[in-house]
């Protein structure tokens, strides 16, 4: 089984990934693949360089470029684990790449929605090198994500978590959903 986790930056995707990892299931981050590719190209890990490489990869290899680069990693992990989580899928082309590469696997899409103002505050607090520090940067990043096609992936989600309350409320939602998916794995569904 493959669980694709999607959502806008700062929505809470990583918390879902962490919950699966706590339970022994591995993950592949498409964002990490772009960051690795940025370094491979001899560029410093800056917000601008990562964004440029992300766009350049799609120009060179198609809209599903990052997914293509991830397929090998996912394949290796599926040999060792019955469930692999893929974090950061941003287009239906990427979903299609995974469906095509793994036709025998059940693929579940989990989307997280968090209101923009709340995401902005969380991203500012997170402090990762590529996180926006101004509302204008935040909006620009959101539009970039939407141009990649993330809205289509969110619309096609099998499960949607709304992350607009307390951390404790979201934790409960995440644990409940992860348990449901794992139960489905054990029964052949979800």
From Swiss-Prot:
Family: Belongs to the UPF0200 family.
Family annotation (InterPro entries): NTP_hydrolase-rel (IPR022970), P-loop_NTPase (IPR027417)
Pfam families: AAA_17
GO molecular function: ATP binding
Organism classification: Archaea, Methanobacteriati, Methanobacteriota, Thermococci, Thermococcales
Gene3D superfamilies: P-loop containing nucleotide triphosphate hydrolases
PANTHER family referenced in this protein's UniProt entry, alphabetically: DEPHOSPHO-COA KINASE (PTHR41930:SF1), UPF0200 PROTEIN MJ1399 (PTHR41930)
Keyword set, alphabetical order: ATP-binding, Nucleotide-binding
Binding positions for ATP per the UniProt entry: 7-14
Organism this protein belongs to: Thermococcus gammatolerans (strain DSM 15229 / JCM 11827 / EJ3)
Protein's recorded name: UPF0200 protein TGAM_0868
